[in-house]
Regions:
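Intracellular loop-helix junctions on the cytosolic face of multi-pass helical membrane proteins
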Residues: 1-73, 77-83, 113, 117-123
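Short, solvent-exposed coil/turn linker segments
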Residues: 11, 71, 93-94, 159
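Helix-boundary and loop/linker segments of multi-pass membrane transporters
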Residues: 42-48, 88, 92, 153-157
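Membrane-embedded alpha-helical bundles of multi-pass transporters/translocases
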Residues: 50-64, 95-186, 190-199
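Short coil/turn segments at secondary-structure boundaries
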Residues: 72, 87-91, 128-130
Length: 199
C-alpha cells in the first residue's frame, strides 16, 4: 500500500475499487458463515437461501436509489432550469432544493401505501413480487431521466418536472422494498443471527 502511495498509483479510482471489492466480499463471507454454522437448523438454512436473492435485489435497489444524492444532484445543478415563472415573476431556487423532494414523497406515499396494504389484506402481492415491482420502479425512474437528453439534447437546461417525476417514481419503489425488506429479514433470519442480519 505504501509502495502504491509513493509511486502515485494510489488514487481515488483505486480507493473506490478497493471498497467495491470489500463491499462484495463481506456479504459473501457472512452468508457463507451463517450457512455453514452449526447453530442453525435445516429449515433456517433453507430460509437463508431464500433470502439471498431478496438481499441482492435490495442491494441493487439501494444502489439506484442512492444515486439521487449524487447523480441527480449534479443533474439538478448542471442541466435543470432553477427558476419558475409565477404571475410574471421569476422565482429562483437552489439545486439543493431537490434533495428535499425524496422525504416529501415519502411523507405523501406512506399513508397511501398503508391504506392500500390494509385494503388489500391477504390479496396483496407477495414479498418477492413487491421487491420485483420496486426494482422495476427504480429502473423506470432512471429510464425516465434518459428522456430529457433524448428529447432536448444535453446542452439544454430542462424543466424541474423531469427530476420531480424521477423521484416520484423511485420512491414508489422504496415504499415497496424498504418496509418489506425489513419484514422479510426478520421472518427469514435464523434466531442465532437475527440481529446481525437485520443490521
Amino acid at each position: 500500500l505504501l509502495g502504491l502511495v509513493f509511486t502515485h498509483q494510489f488514487n481515488v479510482d483505486m480507493i473506490v475499487n478497493i471498497f467495491t471489492v470489500i463491499a462484495v466480499i463481506i456479504p459473501i463471507y457472512y452468508f457463507f458463515k451463517i450457512l455453514s454454522s452449526q447453530k442453525i437448523t435445516a429449515t433456517e438454512r433453507s430460509r437463508v437461501f431464500a433470502y439471498i436473492p431478496l438481499f441482492i435485489a435490495g442491494v441493487l435497489f439501494w444502489s439506484i436509489e442512492e444515486q439521487g444524492s449524487v447523480v441527480l444532484a449534479l443533474f439538478a445543478d448542471d442541466q435543470t432550469r432553477l427558476y419558475f415563472n409565477v404571475f410574471g415573476n421569476q422565482i429562483h431556487f437552489p439545486s439543493s432544493f431537490f434533495q428535499s423532494i425524496n422525504p416529501l414523497f415519502i411523507m405523501i406515499y406512506v399513508p397511501i401505501f398503508a391504506w392500500l396494504w390494509g385494503k388489500m389484506g391477504k390479496k396483496q402481492p407477495s414479498s418477492a413480487k413487491k421487491f420485483a415491482y420496486g426494482l422495476f420502479a427504480a429502473g423506470l425512474s432512471f429510464l425516465w431521466m434518459m428522456l430529457p437528453g433524448m428529447l432536448f439534447g444535453t446542452d439544454v437546461k430542462v424543466s424541474p418536472f423531469w427530476l420531480i417525476m424521477s423521484w416520484a417514481i423511485v420512491i414508489v419503489g422504496e415504499m415497496l422494498i424498504s418496509p418489506i425488506g425489513l419484514s422479510v429479514t426478520t421472518k427469514l433470519a435464523p434466531k442465532s443471527f437475527q440481529a446481525q442480519m437485520m443490521s
